[in-house]
Swiss-Prot record:
Function, as annotated: May be involved in biotic and abiotic stress responses.
Chain residue ranges for the region called Disordered: 359-380, 421-452, 538-575
Taxonomic source organism: Arabidopsis thaliana (Mouse-ear cress)
Gene that specifies this protein: IQM6
Keyword Nucleus: yes
Localization: Cytoplasm; Nucleus
Keyword match Acetylation: no
Domain IQ: 97-124
Protein name per Swiss-Prot or TrEMBL: IQ domain-containing protein IQM6
């Protein structure tokens, strides 16, 4: 029986690979000579014979006490001085180790950004699937509808049209809009404030670029865009800290003898510490673990504790030397309901906390009273759109340029007709709709910490339900297998029964780190869409087997030119 030895090659190239050593001695000499040459090394000083005779790799076997498995490492043994110098460079040089670490960190971030773009692209593909299903539904056979569709049925279908991740079926427009912001914030590799990301996401939706959103925003055609409502400096400055499992232990609070104290340090909780205007927030996890910390606007908020994960309750808290003084449900991220708040009250009673003198409503001086604003009209219906100085680098058109071709006019006409169905069943409050302040956590003045009010930042919800049809090329999607109607209805039905706007509640997977939302968002879609998008982003092992198929993200092999290459493919080969 022939034994093969698996070695990981050390390379300065972009991709490391596992290889099985079965080459001839001549090939091994060439490999060693190339590996030991490097930049600045004189190849003539090291002959293949010296390496073959003086440089070898021998395995050392480490046995665990329970003898369940073996762990083998490879120890280099050499006598040649030049080989020793090369190994010392690899194993001991601080500059090389720092460069290697930097390379690994960048590659890790690049993978996270690609996965975030996959979450955006699969969402756009879901729009296309719904379009296809709606066309088939009009022919009755797809959904097996025997009776003529009623106005109520059309109303239900129009709402289903917007059944996206983070967007529910309720008429609470503010909650849906906030859910979109939280979705963007959660999947962003940098976890930039979703309130700020929404402006750039809106610009991306309405521009002509075919690049995926986060690539477009950071290094693509949109990297020069400086939105007047949210400058680049503010976008990068306000990034939300998502705690990992170890980090959040410092914020875990336990209750002993009716007093709140930090579990790790044993220090009694006192919210009077810190600045006079400091605001303290809490979340109660689904496993009934309480976390409390000081809120930092644009950096640390309710979603920080559990990395945007699911909670039982969230809100504001006031504690004086371990004694609970006030608590109320207020979180722009989780939007706690009365049921959530009562769950927290039950938790406190179970831990023998005296609630007799505890305030359950904010004081007016706390600035928590909800402000009322009138909903601004849809920007789609405005005759004069907001001016945007961004011009697409590839096409030369502004995102707000009116469509000048038949296909774009058809898309807009179809989208407007869908929105017009919303008037078929009038609401009681159509004459005047008042909503709470649309800031992430609580209303503030425009000058306070650089945040704007709802009236200044409001973008109509319809602007975000606009499908970016130019993201995909119709003529290269013939090879794609259609999504089964059972899977389409299964996902729609699964979202119909969810009343919460928490992203974690609308997804079936659970997570504990900042990478979790990106993975969970992908898993929420039918497997056909998942594999299709991952293959296009070169994040699926199936991509190599389907390399012969044309893909909007796959590179087109050309000589002497980069035409036809997708953004992700160019980045993969150039970086």
């Amino acid at each position: 029986m022939e034994t093969k030895t698996i070695l990981r090659s050390i390379s300065f190239n972009d991709i490391d690979s596992d290889s099985t050593i079965t080459e001839s001695p001549e090939a091994r000499k060439t490999l060693y000579n190339r590996s030991l040459s490097g930049k600045g090394t004189q190849r003539s000083r090291i002959s293949p014979g010296d390496v073959e005779n003086n440089f070898s790799i021998k395995p050392l076997t480490f046995m665990k006490e329970d003898d369940r498995y073996k762990m083998r490492i490879w120890k280099p043994v050499c006598e040649n001085e030049h080989a020793k110098e090369f190994l010392a460079l690899l194993l001991g040089d601080g500059t090389y180790q720092a460069a290697l670490k930097l390379q690994k960190v960048y590659r890790s971030f690049r993978t996270r950004r690609r996965l975030a773009d996959c979450a955006v692209v699969v969402e756009q593909r879901w729009w296309k699937v719904l379009d296809f299903a709606e066309l088939k539904r009009s022919s009755i056979s797809f959904f097996e509808i025997e009776k003529q569709e009623t106005a109520v049925s059309r109303w239900s279908r129009a709402r289903t049209r917007a059944a996206k991740v983070g967007k529910g079926l309720s008429k609470d427009e503010k909650a849906r809009k906030l859910a979109l912001q939280h979705w963007l914030e959660a999947i962003d590799p940098r976890h930039r404030y979703g309130h700020n990301l929404q402006f750039y996401y809106h610009a991306w939706l309405h521009c002509d670029s075919k690049q995926p959103f986060f690539y477009w925003l950071d290094i693509g055609q949109g990297k020069e865009l400086n939105h007047e409502r949210c400058p680049r400096s503010k976008l990068y400055q306000q990034s939300i800290k998502y705690l990992g499992p170890t980090e959040r232990e410092a914020y875990e609070v336990i209750i002993e003898d009716g007093k709140l104290m930090y579990k790790q340090s044993g220090i009694v909780l006192d919210t009077k510490e810190g600045p006079p205007d400091a605001k303290w927030i809490f979340v109660l996890s689904v496993s009934k673990i309480l976390y409390v910390g000081m809120k930092k606007k644009g950096n640390f908020q309710h979603s920080s504790f559990l990395a945007g994960g699911a909670t039982l309750s969230a809100g504001r808290i006031v504690v004086d030397d371990g004694v609970l003084k006030a608590v109320w449900p207020h979180s722009g991220h989780y939007l706690p309901t009365e049921e959530n708040f009562q769950a927290f009250m039950s938790f406190l009673r179970e831990n023998n906390v005296d609630l007799a003198n505890v305030k359950k409503n904010p004081d007016e001086e706390d600035g928590e009273a909800p402000a009322k604003v009138k909903r601004m009209p849809s920007r789609i219906k405005e005759t004069e759109e907001e001016h945007c100085d961004f011009v697409d680098a590839e096409t030369g058109f502004s995102p707000n340029t009116k469509p000048n071709n038949h296909a774009e006019l058809q898309t807009l006409s179809r989208f407007h007709s869908k929105l017009s169905r919303l008037d078929e069943i009038p609401d009681e409050d159509d004459n005047m709709i008042e909503e709470e302040q649309d800031d992430e956590e609580e209303p503030e003045t425009p000058s306070e910490q650089g945040y704007e009010t709802a009236e200044e930042t409001f973008i109509a919800e319809e602007e975000f339900t606009y499908p970016k049809s130019n993201l995909f090329d119709e003529d290269i999607e013939d090879y794609e297998k259609p999504v089964l109607k059972e899977k389409i209805m299964r996902r729609i039905d699964s979202h119909k029964g969810i009343k919460s706007y928490q992203l974690a509640e609308r997804l079936h997977s659970r997570w504990s780190t900042g990478a979790g939302p990106r993975i969970s968002c992908m898993r929420d879609y039918p497997s056909e869409l998942q594999f299709r998008v991952l293959e296009q982003a070169h994040l699926s092992p199936r991509a190599s087997s389907n390399s012969s198929k044309i893909s909007p993200f796959a590179p087109v092999r050309t000589r002497g030119t980069s035409l036809g290459r997708s953004p992700l493919a160019e980045e993969l080969e150039n970086l």
